[in-house]
Regions:
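C-terminal secondary-structure termini that scaffold catalytic or DNA-interacting sites
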Residues: 2-3, 335-348
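N-terminal core-binding DNA-recognition domain of tyrosine recombinases/integrases
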Residues: 32-47, 56-142
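Flexible interdomain linker/hinge and immediately adjacent N-terminus
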Residues: 120-168, 213, 252-257
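Basic, Lys/Arg- and aromatic-enriched nucleic-acid-binding interface segment
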Residues: 159-192, 218, 243
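C-terminal catalytic core of tyrosine-transesterase DNA break-rejoin enzymes
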Residues: 183, 288-312, 319
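Active-site/catalytic core of tyrosine-dependent DNA strand-transfer enzymes
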Residues: 226-279
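Catalytic-site neighborhood detector that most strongly recognizes the C-terminal catalytic loop/helix
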Residues: 309, 314-334
Length: 348
């Protein structure tokens, strides 16, 4: 059997537009689609819902290859079901990354627990961490708990773009729209999805403010850098169709002229300019890291940077912090010179 994800737009807010179906007969995989409907009812973002569907598609393909059916009953689940799924992924060539495996296992675990609450708990001591869970509302003693099954992920360090790389990449753009897009990523730290989701009425150029439709339906107001105001003003005056209600960044030519820029269009834009300039690491997320590093060097505090970047937890912001050994030395020397008083006398 072959399975795939289909997109079926619907006005029903309780039904997921993403469905897992058996490709030959068009039959839906009921237990997965019930879980996707549940997540849709929780109002998760469409991209998150699509990601869940893709992860569960991979899981059901594995399950069918082992059990020769996509139907799951509670009795078929064992304590090692997810561990067997991890073994399968780890044996593939080329191997999947630890983060990909963990994301798939986490989604499959949530879906199975929601659909089959009486199924055996997954047990794999080498892949789980024991901890104490707080009692509800902080009343009563903490209870022992076990984390979800996870494989170890190597720590990744994303190095920001250098000044030279940014200048070379920037110089290859010629339209006001493209310059404004890159400017919002570099000067404001916006995600690619946030840039695409902007509407014309999100801009308040006289006040130098922008309303960002953040990740997880969490909008935030941000101040605009003077350079960003200038780039956006040029785009609005010179290139964008005059429609105050339309999307901010639109296609400028072809049959889709005036329609919101698509993810494929944005990826194609960056791919073309990476090839043109030779700056192979230039992508929207790398510009976001570059923004975070520039803000820290400029003296912005971590709590303020967390708000600027739209993070819910400061631990997420710390991932974007990249400080070179030279910067550590310089900041330490400056702090010692400014704040250690009196300077101790060193005997000769």
């Amino acid at each position: 059997m072959k399975f795939r994800v289909v997109h079926q737009p619907t006005a029903n807010a309780a039904r997921s537009p993403f469905r897992i179906v058996e490709q030959t007969a068009g039959r839906e995989v009921d237990w997965i689609n019930r879980y996707l409907d549940y997540e849709c009812l929780r109002r998760v973002a469409p991209l998150t819902l699509r990601s869940y569907a893709q992860h569960l598609l991979h899981f059901v393909r594995w399950w069918e290859s082992v059990h020769h059916t996509d139907v799951i009953v509670g009795e078929a689940l064992t304590e090692s079901t997810l561990l067997d799924y991890v073994r399968f992924q780890s044996a593939q060539q080329p191997p999947f990354s630890g983060s990909t495996i963990n994301q798939r296992v986490a989604v499959a675990d949530r879906a199975l627990r929601a659909t089959f609450p009486d199924a055996p708990k997954q047990v794999a001591p080498e892949f789980q961490v024991s901890y104490w869970r707080r009692a509800p509302m902080g009343l009563g003693r903490p209870m022992p708990a076990v984390s979800r099954l996870r494989v170890r992920e190597p720590k990744r360090t994303i190095v920001p773009l250098s000044v030279e790389d940014v200048a070379r990449f920037w110089s290859s753009f010629h339209t006001s729209r493209d310059l404004a897009i890159v400017g919002l990523m570099l000067l404001q730290g916006l995600r690619s999805q946030e840039v695409r989701d902007l509407n014309r009425d999100d801009l308040r150029l006289p006040e130098a403010e922008i309303r960002v439709p953040g990740k997880g339906n969490k909008p935030r107001m941000l101040p605009l850098a003077p350079e960003a105001v200038q780039l956006l003003d040029h785009y609005l005056r010179l290139e964008r169709p005059d429609d105050p209600t339309a999307p901010l960044f639109v296609s400028l030519k072809g049959p889709a002229r005036g329609a919101r820029m698509t993810p494929a269009g944005l990826r194609s834009l960056f791919r073309y300019h990476r090839h043109t300039t030779g700056v192979k690491r230039a992508n929207p997320h790398r510009f976001r890291h570059t923004f975070a590093s520039d803000m820290l060097r400029g003296g912005v505090s971590l709590p303020a940077l967390m708000r600027l970047m739209g993070h819910a937890h400061i631990q997420t912001t710390l991932i974007y912090v990249h400080v070179t050994p030279l910067e550590v030395y310089q900041q330490y020397a400056r702090a010692v010179a400014q704040h250690i008083r009196p300077i101790p006398v060193i005997p000769s």
